[in-house]
Each structure stands twice: as structure tokens, then as C-alpha cells.
UniProtKB/Swiss-Prot annotation:
Keyword Signal applies: yes
Ranges annotated as biased composition (Pro residues): 439-459
Positions with biased composition (Low complexity): 400-438
Domain remark text: Contains an N-terminal PQQ binding domain and a C-terminal disorganized low-complexity (LC) hydrophilic region.
Summary of the knockout phenotype: Mutant is sensitive to gamma radiation and hypersensitive to desiccation. It shows delayed DNA double-strand break repair and delayed recovery of desiccated nucleoid.
Disulphide-bridged cysteine pairs: none
Organism for this UniProt entry: Deinococcus radiodurans (strain ATCC 13939 / DSM 20539 / JCM 16871 / CCUG 27074 / LMG 4051 / NBRC 15346 / NCIMB 9279 / VKM B-1422 / R1)
Signal peptide: 1-33
Residue ranges, annotated region (Disordered): 400-461
InterPro entries: Beta-ala_Activ/Resist (IPR052091), PQQ_b-propeller_rpt (IPR018391), PQQ_rpt_dom (IPR002372), Quinoprotein_ADH-like_sf (IPR011047), WD40/YVTN_repeat-like_dom_sf (IPR015943)
Protein role: Plays an important role in resistance to desiccation and radiation, maybe by protecting genome integrity under extreme conditions.
Keywords, comma-separated and alphabetical: Signal
Identification of the protein by name: Desiccation/radiation resistance protein DR_1769
Highest taxon above the source species: Bacteria
Amino acid sequence: MPDPAARRFSLPPFPLAALALSVALLGAPASLAQTAAPAPAPAQTPAAASRAAAPRVSWTKPLKVSSPVSIGPRGELTYVGNDSRVHRTDASGKELWSFALGDIGRAQPVLTPDGGVITAAYDDTVYALSPAGQLTWKAKLDGDVFASPALRPDGSVVVATAGGTVYALSSSGQTLWSYKVGAPVFSSPAVAADGTIYFGAQNGRLHALSPEGRLTWTYAARSSVFSSPALDAEGNLYFGSGDRSIYSLSPAGTLRWVQPTGLFVNASPIVTRAGLVVVGSYDGQLYALNTNGQVAWTYAAGAAIAAPAAELSDGSVVVGDLNGTLHAVTPTGQALWTLPGGAKIDTGAAVSDQGTLYFAVDGGNLNAVENLRPLATGPWPTFRASPLGWGRSATAAELTAQTQARQAAAAASTSQQPRLPTLAQAPAPTPAPAQTTPRPQPTPAQPATPAAPVPPVASPAPATARLTPQVIGGVIYLPLSPIAAGLGYQVQAGSPTRALLVAGSQRLTVPVRAVGGQSLIALRFVTGLPGVSVERQAGTLTLRREGLSAALPLDLAQLLPWAPQPEFPGVVRR
């Protein structure tokens, strides 16, 4: 969650006095000690862990972004700006329209199924806009709206205010019911599959309301709950607190476990496809916990984390810190890459189905990193569960639609995988520093059987080399020697994790992996080599460089077969 910046009251997410109190709290009380998870495993650090090549920032634009960014099905962006306007742009940041609000706002806009927008501002008002940016209705509430609204399946929205009231508004803006909390609410409501509404408040309690707005139960944490709850497939909920803890409650409100952290947890958790609860803390650590509360791994970002993380379809996780660095972490908690943002990052990264990642920094600049993976499909892979900002558990039909849309987008962008960063002239290889050695990926349950590699091409020729790809851990790999020879490179030296490609005066160090005595290179790295172009035809992907070419029999349906989505029966993913 971003820090609140309300104009009529100055309430930081955790006052300094409370911070001093939090630091003084050493450990959980006896009643919670038995539920605390084991001590974290040694944290992975950006300096110590293996890295892959960092992607390039495709563009940076001064778009005045203040809120989290919502992304529509076609890649269009919607956000609230620090100019007190709602903006919609295309995927490249070109403005399509804007609408003036009565004040600034930091709530994430909700994108309705018809392309409309529901958003809120610090003028105590919720606004509904048409797909063209025209006002449909607005509703005046009892306080500033910092928490992001939640969209229910019937089109109604649940909105919480700093005035301490939670409202349900109909699709036409009429108040269906309201519930008085008695304390400011900065935690964005989360709606479960059964319609139950969960949110935290500054009174230190996590509240559960029925779909009709009646209080079902509350759970008392030991400090304020600024963090927004995340839900897993079974309806269990996860949130952080100012008492330096991460909590899990059952749908009935009973404590499942609590995990202590070094400082307060204002960030909102996500739940990954593999069943990890991932959330950052002001202690500078990113925590990954199994849903039973055991620490799977921790990652040391080196700066406080207030933003929620996001999971990409390959299982990697991205998160920004308050020093302005965007971190990518492997599914096992190792550093993958980092990107400098230039200013603090306190909102989550937004990821389109087309594989473009957007992250905003303090001051309003928006950065785009293209040709990455799309968002993962799982119970709660990002803040508000969806790029649309719905803030609720998706139905089975919605999950199926999301999965198919992201698979189609991934298939369409196979030739546009992450590129290598700019590669300088490299000297003869020396023992690889940590940041250039990619972490070996998990062994897949059912890897495709590779065909025998084609013998290396003896000399550059216009003939097209034919290569057979294989899939490991959801990543398409090619035999290194044939693909290098087919594109005019010589493999002069290598190790199990890297290789030196030479073409004339050009010397490129690339990440590889050894499987069965053979060096393989990921397709996404090949397509990022300088001068390599890509052509796609039915069933074939052809790579070209300086008159040379290599053809790949790329049958995605065979390489990436549909598999049951374990969290959601009847849902498939590739």
C-alpha cells in the first residue's frame, strides 16, 4: 500500500511514536508464541545471489501517477494523477482521456467489465466514469477515500473511508448499506468467493462483514492494520500489522498462525500460484511463507518495503522498495535482477497480459519494461488480485478466462521475451561474479524429451539450421552450439552456467544451463542478441542474423501443454 497523503489530516502509515513502540516490542506474547513460524532461512541478497541479465526500461514518462495503475484487457492504463485527475492512456502512455476530480487520490481505480472506471479521491467522493471518461454518477461519503474500492460480481462496490465507515454502493451509485467501524480505514476491502468482506482498521482489528453489511467477527492484532488482506483458494486471509507481524486467519476468524518480522508490515500480501504468501516489511526483507506459516525464504532488499509484490507467470516476484529500486526475485527467493527507479516506490508494479510491467515512482514518473512475462494466474497474484483492481476472489469462470487470455497473450509474444541488457565488449572469461551467474531453474515434473542436436554449422551460409526446442520449468530452451553456429557465433569458452559467444570483434557472455551434458540457452536470451530478428509462421519460429537463419519447430500446444490449475479445480493453465 502507498503512504497516505490526505490533505485534511496528516496521518502517516505508522507514526514515529508508534514506530518507537514497535521497536520496543520484542517477540510475540505467550499466547501467540506457539503459532509463530520457525526462524527465517538466511536471506538472499542482491549482492550474494545469482542473477540473470536485467531487462531494459523501455520508456519513462512524466505521467503524474499517484495511485496504483490498473490495466485493461487491451493493455490500456488507468490511474489517478497528482494533478487531481483520472487519466487513461494506451499501453505506450499516450493519453486517451482524463477527468477532473475534486482532490487528489491514491486509491487504485476499478475497471468495470464494460470498460468503465470507478475511482475515489480525498474529497470524500466516489466517481463512476464511462469507458469514454464521462461522469456516470458520483457519491459523497463521510471521509477521504484512501483505501481502494472492491468490485462485487453484481456490479456493486465496497468502499471504506478515513471517516471510519464502510459503504456498499449499487452499480448506479445508491447506498445499499453502511457499517460504522469507529476508526479510520486505510486497508482496502477484500471480497471472498462467498461474498464476505474483509478489511483492517486503525483500531488494530481485522473485520469481517457479511455481504449485507452485518459484522460477522473481528480479530484483534496488537497494532493498526494498514495492510490490505489477500485471500487464498480456500478463503483463508493474510495481512500485515504495525505490530511487526504477518497474520493468517481462517474464514471463521480464528488465528491460523502469526509470523514475526523485524519492523511493521504496511505492505499488502500476495498469494502465489505455488501457495506462497509474499509480503515485504519496513525491515527491508521480503518474506515468503507457506500457507501453513513456515518460512520458505526471505530476500533482503536493502531498504524498507511498503509496496505490494506481483507474481509473473514464470513464478518470479517483483517488488519495489522505498530507496527506489525494483527487485525481481526467483521462485526460491534468489536475486534475479534489479532496476533503479530514481525515487521511492510505494505502489505495486502493474503487469499487463501482454507482458509489459509498469512501475511508478514518487513524483509521478511511470516506467515501462516490455517483453516480460504476463501476470501469474492464481488466487491473489497482485495487489487487488487483478490488474483490473477488483479486490475480490475471482469466480471459476473468471479464472478460466484470465488463464486463457494470458496464455494467448504469452503465445502471441513468444518472440518478444526479455532481452539481454546492452552487452559491452567482454574480455576473456574469468570466474563469473555473482550477478552474472543465473540461478539454475527448478527441474520440471515432465520435461519435453529433446531431439538429438543438429551438428554445428561449419561456416556461415544462407542455409537455415533446423533446431528442436525443449521446455524446462516453463521456459523454452535451445541447444547452445547449433543455435550459436546457425546465427554465426562461435562458442569459445563456457561453464555450466555461462558461455562466451564470439562473432568477429563482438564477444557476448550469455547465461546457459547444463542438462544431460549439453549446454542449453533460453529462447528469450537468443531473441535478445544484437542484430537478431524474429519471423513467425504457423508452427515455425525463424531467427535471422546477418544473412544466416535458424528455424525452430515451435508448436506451443505441444511444448506448453495445458495442465490442471491445482488451486482451482476445472481451471487450466499452460
